[in-house]
């Protein structure tokens, strides 16, 4: 019969082996994600994690469903849309390194107060880079693990890609309605024009829709949307874009 000391030693070895295996898998996964970040620094994506998730959802009801999506390069997206989106989602986009911890803290405190009052409206503290990480690589699910991976990816993206490329990717994979992805598809879906020809008011309204695009696709004339559009129209000229 093995001695207690020997049994404890065997258990220690097993636990150590399991921990090392988990660490190796985690490191390999991060290396894989980093390789994808490098790939998309130079290659345009044909789809994204959020697109694939949404297409699967739509095809549960309609097997023939397709997404509206068309990639366009940075110089074929109007500066008005770039300004409006930065003003709406991340006014300090050109200055931070991917994550704004103060914004995350304020959003968390606000959401805690909302929850205590029984209110469902929450505020996000994610930068454009974080949103890109989620849209391109992850999913819409909410968990601490996914949020942690989003933060890691945001730093990877910022260290590999210039700001112009980050914004180009974001504008092309952002969700803008039911099955509508990217600036070009959004411009054609709502205004029957191209992303390059969007006016200031049109761009501001599209930017205002970003926090809840499926809802605003079905409710295009709410008081909040009109008010937010007016606010962004005033603010957008004051932000810096790459």
Curated annotation (Swiss-Prot):
Which reaction does this chain catalyze? [GlcNAc-(1->4)-Mur2Ac(oyl-L-Ala-gamma-D-Glu-L-Lys-D-Ala-D-Ala)](n)-di-trans,octa-cis-undecaprenyl diphosphate + beta-D-GlcNAc-(1->4)-Mur2Ac(oyl-L-Ala-gamma-D-Glu-L-Lys-D-Ala-D-Ala)-di-trans,octa-cis-undecaprenyl diphosphate = [GlcNAc-(1->4)-Mur2Ac(oyl-L-Ala-gamma-D-Glu-L-Lys-D-Ala-D-Ala)](n+1)-di-trans,octa-cis-undecaprenyl diphosphate + di-trans,octa-cis-undecaprenyl diphosphate + H(+)
Which keywords fit this entry according to its UniProt record? Cell inner membrane, Cell membrane, Cell shape, Cell wall biogenesis/degradation, Glycosyltransferase, Membrane, Peptidoglycan synthesis, Transferase, Transmembrane, Transmembrane helix
| One cellular-component annotation, GO | plasma membrane
**EC category:** transferase
EC numbers on record: 2.4.99.28
Keyword Signal recorded: no
Gene Ontology BP term (one): regulation of cell shape
Q: Which domain of life is it from?
A: Bacteria
Which ranges of the sequence are coiled-coil? none
Location(s) in or outside the cell: Cell inner membrane
Specify the pathway: Cell wall biogenesis; peptidoglycan biosynthesis
For this protein, the record's Gene3D superfamilies field holds: Biosynthetic peptidoglycan transglycosylase-like
How this chain sits in the membrane, per its record, is: Single-pass membrane protein
Q: Read off the InterPro entries from this record.
A: Glyco_trans_51 (IPR001264), Lysozyme-like_dom_sf (IPR023346), PBP_transglycosylase (IPR036950), Pep_trsgly (IPR011812)
The residues that cross the membrane are 18-38
Keyword set includes Glycoprotein: no
Write out the GO MF terms: pentosyltransferase activity; peptidoglycan glycosyltransferase activity
* Record function comment: Peptidoglycan polymerase that catalyzes glycan chain elongation from lipid-linked precursors.
Q: Which family does it belong to?
A: Belongs to the glycosyltransferase 51 family.
Q: What is this protein called?
A: Biosynthetic peptidoglycan transglycosylase
- Record gene name: mtgA
